[in-house]
């Protein structure tokens, strides 16, 4: 009977707490917010520790999209603009003429 009493007195039969209850808060804060770092590292890399601001990210994505669209527009205008040039004929009149290659 002493073996039965020793097993119940050791606490194995009842509910047990997990041994790493102190490490549990590290799992609750995802990312680098829960990691212990120096204040210098946090000052140099603040974007790793602050919560993302979704309206600011949406505004930045919109601005980047507008810039890329404008660059595409300028590229299209430049290509169509290079195909024509102003030529002067023997009478002195000017007209627009399509560029031709000397190799054709």
UniProtKB/Swiss-Prot annotation:
PANTHER family: SMALL INTEGRAL MEMBRANE PROTEIN 8 (PTHR14274:SF1). InterPro entries: UPF0708 (IPR026686). This is Small integral membrane protein 8. The chain crosses the membrane at residues 55-77. The keyword Transmembrane applies. Residues 1-11 have a biased composition (Low complexity). The keyword Transmembrane helix applies. Its main location: membrane. It comes from Danio rerio (Zebrafish). It comes from the Eukaryota. Belongs to the SMIM8 family. It is found in: Membrane. It is a single-pass membrane protein. Residues 1-31 are annotated as: Disordered. GO terms for cellular component: membrane. Keywords: Membrane, Transmembrane, Transmembrane helix.
């Amino acid at each position: 009977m002493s073996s039965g009493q020793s097993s119940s007195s050791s606490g194995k039969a009842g509910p047990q707490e997990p041994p790493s209850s102190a490490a549990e808060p590290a799992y609750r804060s995802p990312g680098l917010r829960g990691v212990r770092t120096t204040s210098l590292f946090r000052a140099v890399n603040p974007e790793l520790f602050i919560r993302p601001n979704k309206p600011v990210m949406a505004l930045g994505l919109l601005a980047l999209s507008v810039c890329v669209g404008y660059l595409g527009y300028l590229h299209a205008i430049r290509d169509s603009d290079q195909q024509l040039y102003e030529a002067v004929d023997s009478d002195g009149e000017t007209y627009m003429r399509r560029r031709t290659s000397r190799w054709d």
